[in-house]
């Protein structure tokens, strides 16, 4: 399927045209990307490999971290490469691919946060029935549903955009391909089209964000009936989830609950959502949860101990013992 357009390539103006600022941003994005990948993959490996994190809550956290790592890899390297180029050109198919991946993973993460909120609600409101309600099969099905939700949302965006005529010019004042910058290139009035985009993106974000805030309030209310020790154990998980929900949904609402328009501030918001937030998520979850920190410490100390035991005999072959040296 081809779009109703003669445009085959777009030129992105990027974040800035200042060479010095580009170099600074490149170094900053590279460091953030490394921290993001290390943090998210560390959580994923720790959650999968640590017996102490056998709770199904950490099952969802593991795949949220994996999703963030994939999202970061899909966005950050392209942004960093663009900072080294004088002209940022992207083909129509690559632009559509970037848009598809962005909304696929972003949509899946939104639905996964809903699933995680439901998981916490069941764990706190019905602790005796938790393992019956949230068994592993149910968790896998909910994870698949979250991915399908993101896929449907992304496909709707792409199919909708492909059916519209793009007249040009082919210059996009943005750092990535996104819906509103592309809609500004259309040959027709974008008012009603913008309402459709708001319905498929912004309103969904607002409704889910409101639902999640209410659910967090209900969960916090349930915690009042718990003992002080149980509250102290459950509260960091709830607070971490609330912070991550705010980091994900506030930029989404800002960018998609409005008429079709492209503001300079959108570039910073895109960087915050697609780079900064993905770095903060693992830090928030790991630093606020003692179970996660202890599991990381125990797992990696155990791994280092195993490596040390395997390496020591090999080193002893090459390093003569003190007794052998004295005999000589």
From Swiss-Prot:
Disulfide bonding pattern of the chain: 95-187
Segments crossing the lipid bilayer: 24-47, 56-77, 99-118, 138-156, 194-217, 234-256, 268-287
Ranges per topology, Cytoplasmic: 48-55, 119-137, 218-233, 288-328
Keyword Transmembrane among UniProt keywords: yes
Keyword tags: Cell membrane, Disulfide bond, G-protein coupled receptor, Glycoprotein, Membrane, Olfaction, Receptor, Sensory transduction, Transducer, Transmembrane, Transmembrane helix
Keyword Disulfide bond: yes
Chief place where the protein resides: membrane
GO terms of molecular function: G protein-coupled receptor activity; olfactory receptor activity
Pfam families listed in its UniProt record: 7tm_4
Family: Belongs to the G-protein coupled receptor 1 family.
Function: Odorant receptor.
Name of the protein: Olfactory receptor 4A16
Lineage, broadest ranks: Eukaryota, Metazoa, Chordata, Craniata, Vertebrata
Protein encoded by which gene: OR4A16
